[in-house]
Amino acid sequence: MDILKSYHLLAAAYSAPAWASFMAGAFLVLTLSLSLFLVFDHLSTYKNPEEQKFLIGVILMVPCYSIESFASLVKPSISVDCGILRDCYESFAMYCFGRYLVACIGGEERTIEFMERQGRKSFKTPLLDHKDEKGIIKHPFPMNLFLKPWRLSPWFYQVVKFGIVQYMIIKSLTALTALILEAFGVYCEGEFKWGCGYPYLAVVLNFSQSWALYCLVQFYGATKDELAHIQPLAKFLTFKSIVFLTWWQGVAIALLSSLGLFKSSIAQSLQLKTSVQDFIICIEMGIASVVHLYVFPAKPYGLMGDRFTGSVSVLGDYASVDCPIDPDEIRDSERPTKVRLPHPDVDIRSGMTIKESMRDVFVGGGEYIVKDVRFTVTQAVEPMEKSITKFNEKLHKISQNIKKHDKEKRRVKDDSCMSSSPSRRVIRGIDDPLLNGSFSDSGVTRTKKHRRKSGYTSAESGGESSSDQAYGGFEVRGRRWITKD
């Protein structure tokens, strides 16, 4: 806690050098000018809403990064808050980029149809015969140790969609958690201590971010031929460098600073590690804004005819009017799309006003976000509900088995008590069969009665011969046996 207090005191007392603030401010102005120009250019040629609404979200990532980095550079005490907001928009930009690629294919339905078509073709040949089969996604090392090859199918699209959206959800939740922990002084950014919240959130975020990037890379690898008309490699590399290289750049700066290897005059003038990172990001975003003008231009949309809500993809072979379109041949073709023709709609004006375009970006894009977030949460909750249901069923089954076992045990115990009881009573004393004559044979009974009478008589008269013959070393007195002296 003392280190955290000293850090806040240093951040409050520290101010960036004038030359650093001036240079970062110049790049900020350049970034805002070029990025806003590109955004308004897309809004003025807003003829393909399904693509452009998400493309604008990707373009706005550059000015957002630049503004937050400049604010953190000028006032280091809010660097944690700025970094959290920057990370939140990073996850949103990744979602927009994934949605943009899907829209360029023709939407979710056409993307799923494309994957089903490629997946059906992969069934025709064994998996080991063709290493570069299009319908199979093979994982690189070390992911191949944990995951089996993925076959293109609607399931694959759902995995990619879930992987990208989960990062946006987890990033937002961890950002809110970090703000709460920072308010209580237990966030400790950059410190790996058991009592700090930073290492735990960092582990969760790194895993979520890595999985989202992996899903995006696999989706790009599966659809790059279908996306050839938009030159996806340049767009993908530009986006990936902004999102992920900036993060690894921050890790490298922190590592070099902790090892004492940052001994340049510029690094020493920028005392805090976050200030070095913010200064570099301001310069990088100025360069990225220039690259965006060439990678995400609005000119292709301006050349389109009427505005359309969806896209129809046909092959260049059918551009001739004399050749009728064969839907089956188009569906089964493996070649990428070359000509994209819009639906003619005479009731819709060609283009929209900037106000209408902005409303569609926020409202229309928000509808997609809500739908995808609901889908992701459902996909995450349903397995948990099924697991809980199965667990409850197992507990109920175990309870029933225990009750059944106890019931059988009690029944066996009762049966054993009944079977252990003697079939004949062993009676002694006055109930002795020798005295009462319990034998069923009447002759024997009469003989015993006769002997009993003779015994009584002999005992009273002093004669002992008959008693000795009947009972050996015993004699009877009354109804009891006694030993003979």
Swiss-Prot record:
Residues 455-469 have a biased composition (Polar residues). It is found in: Endomembrane system; Cell membrane; Cytoplasm, Cytosol. Residues 403-416, 476-485 have a biased composition (Basic and acidic residues). Residues 1-19, 75-167, 218-241, 299-485 are cytoplasmic. Residues 384-415 form a coiled coil. It is a multi-pass membrane protein. Keywords: Cell membrane, Coiled coil, Cytoplasm, Membrane, Transmembrane, Transmembrane helix. The chain crosses the membrane at residues 20-40, 54-74, 168-188, 197-217, 242-262, 278-298. Disruption phenotype: Suppresses acd11-dependent cell death. Laz1 acd11 double mutants survive throughout development to flower and set seeds, in contrast to the fate of acd11. It comes from the Eukaryota. Residues 400-485 are annotated as: Disordered. GO terms for cellular component: cytosol; endomembrane system; membrane; plant-type vacuole membrane; plasma membrane. Belongs to the TMEM184 family. PANTHER family: ORGANIC SOLUTE TRANSPORTER-RELATED. Required for programmed cell death (PCD) associated with hypersensitive response (HR). Involved both in the induction of EDS1/PAD4 mediated HR and in accelerated cell death in the acd11 mutant. Not required for HR induction elicited through pathways exclusively dependent on CC-NB-LRR resistance proteins. This is Protein LAZ1. It comes from Arabidopsis thaliana (Mouse-ear cress). The gene is LAZ1.
